[in-house]
């Protein structure tokens, strides 16, 4: 049996929680992704605890708790400034919607609880002494760098079809391969993904797209036909098959969506609809639209100073990132140097505003807005100095 002696601080801080449960006569273990990650020597973001104690019994042991999912056996305990999700050992049955169990039964056996987990590498538990409980050879699969469903993969994917997306996501993040039967079960059941909300699919897709192994995972995403069951990807395998051949994997979400849109050869007027279909925020949609606009400009010609000003620093850096990933030859240093040399980089830096123009005798209205815009363009292109005096001279010449 494997024993881990030097546990990260996130575990040692939680030890008193397990100890209190054990002192009360219950079993308690760390479980799931945190155990997997500590075995892989990866950073552990948060921990989950599983116990033989029923939710009400957990609540009796700790002063502060929140009923986060008490119907399914989960209580969040607040202890020493940290929050811990503690879930009762359980079995699940009846998955009519392919998303969540119709029935949850609390059990007193860790083995039964681990059987319901998605993949062997996640069906690992660790006790307070650092001993690893591994019923399904998850440690061996970690060594082999393999993602294998617990038990029958068809059953696991019928229980929650999102697990198919989680499989390719873990491929990307952990740089693992899919076990043969697990991959075949995804290919045979990919249409079940249509039963899952876009929000849940999107979360897994983004994690897959930003993983270090995303190009390899994306190939499996295409080969298993999962791509046929997500918004706007059906019938687009030929266009999307460029993704696995990219020089680099994206590390920013804006780059991920921009690259997908460029590969799909999507007209600019369709971007908003596409992003909404994927349940992206308005802010994310706007950022991606700005990147695509500048990317198109750079692909056609060297952008003017004013076009660089309109794009802004964030959009410029993100667009250069997208071009770099796509292998698009652009003079990125020259573009950044030109942007940094602009007299102003945002409208608020202009020496005058609308009030100044009114003081000069202009009436509020469209003409004033047009004049202000022209002044901004002239300042950005260094045709007028960014001073009130120089702008006054320009206004006098207009009269």
Curated annotation (Swiss-Prot):
The keyword Glycosyltransferase does not apply. Mg(2+) binds at residues 46, 48. Its cofactor is Mg(2+). Catalyzes the addition and repair of the essential 3'-terminal CCA sequence in tRNAs without using a nucleic acid template. Adds these three nucleotides in the order of C, C, and A to the tRNA nucleotide-73, using CTP and ATP as substrates and producing inorganic pyrophosphate. tRNA 3'-terminal CCA addition is required both for tRNA processing and repair. Also involved in tRNA surveillance by mediating tandem CCA addition to generate a CCACCA at the 3' terminus of unstable tRNAs. While stable tRNAs receive only 3'-terminal CCA, unstable tRNAs are marked with CCACCA and rapidly degraded. SUPFAM superfamilies: Nucleotidyltransferase, Poly A polymerase C-terminal region-like. Belongs to the tRNA nucleotidyltransferase/poly(A) polymerase family. Bacterial CCA-adding enzyme type 3 subfamily. It comes from Lactobacillus acidophilus (strain ATCC 700396 / NCK56 / N2 / NCFM). Transmembrane segments: none annotated. Homodimer. Its EC number is 2.7.7.72. This is CCA-adding enzyme. NCBIfam families: PRK13299.1. It catalyses: a tRNA precursor + 2 CTP + ATP = a tRNA with a 3' CCA end + 3 diphosphate; a tRNA with a 3' CCA end + 2 CTP + ATP = a tRNA with a 3' CCACCA end + 3 diphosphate. The keyword DNA-binding does not apply. One of its GO terms (biological process) is RNA repair. Pfam families: PolyA_pol, PolyA_pol_RNAbd, tRNA_NucTran2_2. ATP binds at residues 33, 36, 117, 160, 163, 166, 169. One of its GO terms (molecular function) is CCA tRNA nucleotidyltransferase activity. A single active site specifically recognizes both ATP and CTP and is responsible for their addition. CTP binds at residues 33, 36, 117, 160, 163, 166, 169.
């Amino acid at each position: 049996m494997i024993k881990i002696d030097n546990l990260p601080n996130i575990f040692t801080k939680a030890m008193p929680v397990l100890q209190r449960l054990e002192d009360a006569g219950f079993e308690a273990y760390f479980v799931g992704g945190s155990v997997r990650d500590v075995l892989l020597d990866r950073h552990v973001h948060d921990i989950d605890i599983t116990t033989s104690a029923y939710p009400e019994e957990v609540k009796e042991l700790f002063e502060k708790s929140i009923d986060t999912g008490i119907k399914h056996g989960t209580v969040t305990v607040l202890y020493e400034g940290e929050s811990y999700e503690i879930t009762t050992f359980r079995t699940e049955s009846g998955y009519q919607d392919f998303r969540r169990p119709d029935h949850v039964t609390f059990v007193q056996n860790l083995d039964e609880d681990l059987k319901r987990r998605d993949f062997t590498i996640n069906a690992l538990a660790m006790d307070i002494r650092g001993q690893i409980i591994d019923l399904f050879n998850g440690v061996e699969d970690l060594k082999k760098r393999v993602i294998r469903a617990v038990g029958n993969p068809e059953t696991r994917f019928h229980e929650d079809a999102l697990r198919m997306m989680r499989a390719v996501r873990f491929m990307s993040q952990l740089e693992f391969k899919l076990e043969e039967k697990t991959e075949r079960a995804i290919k045979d059941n990919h249409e079940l993904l249509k039963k899952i909300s876009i929000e849940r699919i999107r979360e897994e897709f983004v994690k897959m797209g930003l993983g270090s192994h995303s190009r390899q995972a994306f190939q499996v995403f295409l080969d298993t036909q999962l791509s046929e069951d997500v918004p706007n990807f059906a019938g687009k395998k030929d266009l999307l098959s460029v993704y696995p051949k990219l020089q680099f994997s994206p590390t920013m979400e804006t780059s991920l969506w921009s690259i997908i849109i460029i590969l799909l050869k999507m007209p600019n007027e369709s971007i908003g609809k596409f992003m909404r279909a994927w349940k992206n925020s308005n802010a994310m949609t706007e950022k991606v639209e700005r990147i695509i606009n500048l990317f198109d400009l750079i692909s056609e010609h060297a952008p003017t100073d004013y076009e660089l000003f309109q794009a802004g620093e964030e959009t410029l850096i993100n667009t250069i990132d997208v071009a770099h990933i796509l292998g698009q030859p652009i003079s990125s240093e020259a573009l950044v140097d030109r942007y940094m040399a602009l007299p102003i980089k945002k409208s608020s830096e202009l020496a005058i505003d609308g009030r100044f123009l009114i003081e000069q005798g202009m009436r509020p209205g469209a003409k004033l807005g047009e004049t202000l815009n022209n002044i901004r363009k002239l300042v950005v292109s260094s045709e007028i100095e960014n001073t009130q005096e120089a702008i006054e001279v320009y206004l006098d010449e207009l009269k």
